[in-house]
């Protein structure tokens, strides 16, 4: 996978937010309602935009693993999530490398993991209910995608993918 700068991710984030399918976000919201606590692995997390986009629509207790090969982007994610939490009146603290963002009805735990995902997700033995992959699948091989779906199946995890482009255009009059 290619590296991206935080500046580039900043430029595309408003368009990415607008491009997310609201019906899929609604389905995630409904699905997450079955869980008291949802455990999410965000692959290719970048600056954490997927968390910021869908976490408010999910259950009140969530644990996120933001996984990216770039420690620089993960550092940016921590900074941006702190600002995001402040804007939502969530208190923020760090306990043993686990970031906590807590509000009246929300409780988010976030761990930042620097991993090279070139061969697929690395299993750390953590419980995973949902895997998110945003703007990544168009950068990886068919084999990588097959490994991802196999990993999700083995974990019993749901898979949310978005913002992927296959390079094809279709026009109709």
Task: For each feature predicted by the language model, list its residue ranges.
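Class I SAM-dependent methyltransferase Rossmann-like catalytic core
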Residues: 1-35, 47
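Conserved S-adenosyl-L-methionine
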Residues: 44
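Glycine-rich SAM-binding Motif I of class I
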Residues: 48-52
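Class I SAM-dependent methyltransferase SAM/SAH-binding core
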Residues: 54-119
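Short conserved loop adjoining the S-adenosyl-L-methionine
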Residues: 119-125
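A conserved beta-strand element that flanks and buttresses the S-adenosyl-L-methionine
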Residues: 132
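A short, conserved alpha-helix within the catalytic core of class I
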Residues: 139-152
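Conserved class I S-adenosyl-L-methionine
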Residues: 160-173
